[in-house]
Amino acid sequence: MIKLINLSLVLSLLFSLTAFNLIAQQNMTNVYGRRMQSLNGKWDAIVDLYDQGRKNKIYLNKKPENKTDFYEYAFENGLRLNVPSDWNSQMPELKYYEGTIWYGRKFGAVKASGDRLFLHFGAVSYRCRIYLNGQEIAQHEGGFTPFQIEITDAVKENDNFLAVEVNNTRRVDAIPAMAFDWWNYGGITRDVFLVSTPKIFIDDYFVQLDKIKADKINAHVKLSDKLANSSITIEIPELRLKQTLKTNAQGEVKTSFISKEIKRWSPAAPKLYKVKISTQDDQIEEEIGFRNIWVKGEDIFLNGEAIFLKSISFHEEIPQRKGRAFSQADAVVLLSEAKALGCNMIRLAHYPQNEYIVRMAEKMGFLLWEEIPIWQGIDFENESTKEKAGKMMGEMVARDKNRCALAFWGVANETQPSEPRNAFIRHLIATCRAIDTSRLIIAAFDLVRFNKEKQTFVMDDPFTKELDVVAVNKYLGWYHSWPVSPDKAVWDVAKGQPLIISEFGGEALYGKTGEKDVASSWSEDYQETLYKNNLEMFKHIPNLRGTSPWVLFDFRSPFRFHPTNQDGWNRKGLISDQGYRKKAWFLMKHYYDNK
């Protein structure tokens, strides 16, 4: 009997190890265009400060079976947390919490015969383990990109128990690492869905205008399985374009369409076309725009015309709520203020933001710069960190490669030159270009210095030559004093390439008045002067092709210690945490309206 029990345990263990690849899968393209069942709502939760939950197997969700049974945990009748949302903003006790919280909920699965079922997470911050009906089925690291797990053979029609172990502890090998200038939100911060597909489904596609040609659309579609000689139809009805093709041995088709009637997407006219992709068993629809973007010399060309990028940055945060933005309504709040400022581009700082923001930005006519949080302090010599970064970059590009608004893939922010850093960033660039060669590669540097001998601003980082566009963060008048008057500031940075000032500005407490030439006044008057000086300097940068003030809204940050002027907020916003526009906002509005 003992031998039989042991054999049973071994077989059970082998099944559990082989039934699931514990590394979560990269998400299928366009989850929001699939058949979905939402798992959003109130979830039960357990705060696990000492990380005892896994050791005690609380994911089994056991209940007493006899008079002597008891368990020192229960998901029911305790803490309940909203999903999607961060946990920090839901309870005062969790405001600064860094550690593990377990989420749990029951669900039934609606699955037609022959269908496959996937569990989709828009993002979980920062690392997580997923358990279904007592079995660990996946792990994922990275707080800003989607992932999925196939649960077709593990799910029951009724009474499934899903547990998610979430941990947001900062670590040296994480991305971002130990210190970063925004709030360390933890939790299931984006949508959770059950996604139903046919047995063989349309897994991935990439439909975009050629990088240069205005009349050529390139399309690549891949099935979920390596199935040859299967028919795939691609159609753009408004352009009267339609092709049916046979898959190769990899289950893929590649083709091109030619049309002289394509109206190209631009910030002034954000035209999108309905694209239909179908097989015998599956069909998916998507709105896709078509545009060309390239660099020539010191200029950036959109649809063949040189463009000046009137940008702004914001965090994925609703300051009035002091929490993560996660809904379409939140996207409207953030993007409407960017539109009011007169922007034609947004730098989504400093991580991939949710799909509602990306898709809404495209419809509203914003170009986008998207990046993963390679933000200072990254351990560039750690191979594990490098692998994580590559995976995050791949997940970001895969999710948003069909968004024509995406113009720039950002690969770094404020990093120090070294061979390990260069190798690390080259790995990210290669990851991007393996998926998508149509976008421009950009990075933001903070190494511009004033050369007293030449009386010129210069930057010593040869890596700029490996980028399509160079960006600079420079806080003159705030972290750096003015070595010359703004009208005498001469720049010799990234000569021969387009240059964007990707961050500038300073802090001001809304409503506070003070001396306009004293930084420590923390006043709107000083912030206004600072902006005037920077805008004057910009006139004298010959290859300047865009500006992006830091930042649209005040945002939460434990970096910021001043008890009266900051109180845990970075006050560089043009708009206060309560939604009021500061004096500098009106300066930028005038500047953008006249560019």
Where do the PLM segments sit?
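Accessory beta-strand-rich segments of carbohydrate-active enzymes
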Residues: 29-30, 46-50, 93-201, 226-227, ...
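Short strand-turn-strand beta-turns centered on an Asx-Gly dipeptide
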Residues: 131-137, 237, 280-281, 303
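Extended acidic/polar, glycine-enriched regions
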Residues: 155-159, 222-296
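Accessory carbohydrate-binding/adhesion or oligomerization-edge regions at the termini
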Residues: 23-88, 163-165, 171, 532, ...
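N-terminal carbohydrate-binding accessory modules
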Residues: 29-34, 205-208, 264, 276-339, ...
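Surface beta-strand/loop "capping" patches
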Residues: 199-226, 595
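Bacterial Sec-dependent N-terminal signal peptides
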Residues: 1-27
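Substrate-binding/catalytic cleft of secreted carbohydrate-active enzymes
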Residues: 220, 333-335, 345-591
